[in-house]
């Protein structure tokens, strides 16, 4: 008899078929308490869980005594109670490598669109304001040869540094938990403390996961140390930034502009002051949102779950010691 797994996000037909070759698959709309209660017997028997954008906490795990592995269609896993999973010897699988290049593209797009005011001036054209040759009030700022500060030099940070160094001749500063020899050798990146990065960078790109240590890492103090001409980019996790402090910094002119793919609360409230600021490019968490990459992430998540439930945990596992 095939192991039972619960799928809480739709998959392309071919990936669903691959999953069904190995497991009895039960599809549910979400992991809300109501859904769990209505499908109590299914949850009680499930050995695997696959999906994204839902919280997996101790309360849910209590309803799933046979769960052995959960696979998320994402690189981030701050919506999972890792301690609770580990205590129950449940493997947590994620998709850390599939989306690297695509998210780096998104970061570079935010750098360019904020600096050159692409969204703002495009809207002015659509509004019929382009009635003569443009003047300085339409101008943006250069990206090439400007200093890029990267906070978090992981896979995505490296991919961004590659684009900035080779494509735009940008000097690169970075701050991370440790020195990154490859970044320094390939891109001439310079390691520095966070204060130095903030003070010297023309663009500050935040690429950090959400943890207890990174929550509200960026607040009024950090924005106050940035150049008034600096542009802030966040495509990591929204709560790493104190959004009220960011709004205040933009309103006071402490920083020049912001390009944001993530927010403290998502979806972003329609009455957020960020949406009324011409110098803010706000997009709906599109970091990995291309057809190709989202398919690749789903395929990776399916393979991860198959491997985990077959005892083949060699990569993409958040808590691999559980398998020991």
Swiss-Prot record:
The species this protein was found in: Escherichia coli O6:K15:H31 (strain 536 / UPEC)
**InterPro entries reported in the protein's UniProt record:** D-isomer_2-hydroxyacid_DH, D-isomer_2_OHA_DH_cat_dom, D-isomer_DH_CS, D-isomer_DH_NAD-bd, Glyo/OHPyrv_Rdtase_B, NAD(P)-bd_dom_sf
What's the protein name?
Glyoxylate/hydroxypyruvate reductase B
Classification via CDD domains: GDH (cd05301)
Tell me, in a sentence or two, what this protein's role is: Catalyzes the NADPH-dependent reduction of glyoxylate and hydroxypyruvate into glycolate and glycerate, respectively.
What lineage does the source organism belong to?
Bacteria, Pseudomonadati, Pseudomonadota, Gammaproteobacteria, Enterobacterales
Transmembrane regions? none
Which family is annotated? Belongs to the D-isomer specific 2-hydroxyacid dehydrogenase family. GhrB subfamily.
Q: What class of enzyme is it?
A: oxidoreductase
Query: Where does the record say this protein resides?
Result: Cytoplasm
Q: Which GO cellular component terms are attached? A: cytosol; plasma membrane
Which Enzyme Commission number(s) are on file for it?
Answer: 1.1.1.79, 1.1.1.81
* Gene of this entry: ghrB
**HAMAP family to which the protein is assigned, alphabetical:** 2_Hacid_dh_C_GhrB
State the UniProt keywords alphabetically: Cytoplasm, NAD, NADP, Oxidoreductase
Q: Which residues constitute the catalytic centre?
A: 237, 266, 285 (proton donor)
Listed under catalytic activity are: glycolate + NADP(+) = glyoxylate + NADPH + H(+); (R)-glycerate + NAD(+) = 3-hydroxypyruvate + NADH + H(+); (R)-glycerate + NADP(+) = 3-hydroxypyruvate + NADPH + H(+)
Entry's Gene Ontology molecular function annotations: glyoxylate reductase (NADPH) activity; hydroxypyruvate reductase (NADH) activity; hydroxypyruvate reductase (NADPH) activity; NAD binding
Q: Which PANTHER family match?
A: 2-HYDROXYACID DEHYDROGENASE-RELATED, GLYOXYLATE_HYDROXYPYRUVATE REDUCTASE B
Partners and quaternary state?
Answer: Homodimer.
């Amino acid at each position: 008899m095939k192991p039972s797994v619960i799928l809480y996000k739709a998959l392309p037909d071919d990936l669903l078929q691959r999953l069904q070759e190995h497991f009895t698959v039960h599809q549910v709309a979400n992991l809300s308490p109501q859904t769990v209660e209505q499908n109590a017997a299914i949850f009680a028997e499930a050995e695997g869980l696959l999906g994204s954008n839902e919280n997996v906490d101790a309360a849910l795990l209590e309803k799933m005594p046979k769960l052995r592995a959960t696979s998320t269609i994402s690189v981030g896993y701050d919506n999972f109670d890792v301690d609770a999973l580990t205590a129950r010897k449940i493997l947590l699988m994620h998709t850390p490598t599939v989306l690297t290049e695509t998210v780096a593209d998104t970061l570079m797009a935010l750098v360019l669109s904020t600096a050159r005011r692409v969204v703002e001036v495009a809207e002015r054209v659509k509004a019929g304001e382009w009635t003569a040759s443009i003047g300085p009030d339409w101008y943006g700022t250069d990206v090439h040869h400007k200093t890029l500060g990267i906070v978090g030099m992981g896979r995505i940070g490296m991919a961004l540094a590659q684009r900035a160094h080779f494509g735009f001749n940008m000097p690169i500063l970075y701050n991370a938990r440790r020195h990154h020899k490859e970044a320094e050798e390939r891109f001439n990146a310079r390691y520095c403390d966070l204060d130095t990065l903030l003070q010297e960078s023309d663009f500050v790109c935040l690429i950090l996961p959400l943890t207890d240590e990174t929550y509200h890492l960026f607040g009024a103090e950090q924005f106050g140390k940035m150049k008034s001409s600096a542009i802030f980019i966040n495509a990591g996790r929204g709560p790493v930034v104190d959004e009220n402090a960011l709004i205040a910094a933009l309103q006071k002119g402490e920083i020049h502009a912001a390009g944001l793919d993530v927010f403290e609360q998502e979806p972003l409230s329609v009455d957020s002051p960020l949406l009324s600021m011409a110098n803010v490019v706000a997009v709906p968490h599109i970091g990995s949102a291309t057809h190709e990459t989202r398919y690749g992430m789903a395929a990776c998540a399916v393979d991860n779950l198959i491997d985990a439930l077959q005892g083949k945990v060699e990569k993409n596992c958040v808590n691999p010691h559980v398998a020991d």
